């Protein structure tokens, strides 16, 4: 069986609220760390989310 190309990652809020999203990314084409602007419901604003490991 072949190794899967997509991996699950955790997007952690940079606002320090502890909120996170779980998403997938293609590890072969996106080798750098992912940063996305998404909505944080704790602070009720759009903030930057940075990639972290799923524990």
Curated annotation (Swiss-Prot):
Coiled-coil residues: none
Gene of this entry: rpmG
Gene Ontology cellular-component annotations: cytosolic large ribosomal subunit
Any GO MF annotation of the entry: structural constituent of ribosome
Keyword terms of this UniProt record: Ribonucleoprotein, Ribosomal protein
Family: Belongs to the bacterial ribosomal protein bL33 family.
NCBIfam families: PRK00595.1, rpmG_bact
Any matching Pfam family: Ribosomal_L33
Record lineage: Bacteria, Pseudomonadati, Pseudomonadota, Alphaproteobacteria, Rhodobacterales
Organism: Paracoccus denitrificans (strain Pd 1222)
One Gene Ontology biological process: translation
Protein name per its UniProtKB record: Large ribosomal subunit protein bL33
């Amino acid at each position: 069986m072949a190794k899967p190309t997509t991996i699950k990652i955790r997007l952690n809020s940079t606002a320090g609220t502890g909120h996170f999203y779980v998403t997938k990314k293609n590890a072969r084409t996106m080798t750098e760390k992912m940063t996305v602007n998404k909505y944080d419901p704790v602070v009720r604003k759009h903030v930057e989310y940075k990639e972290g490991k799923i524990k």
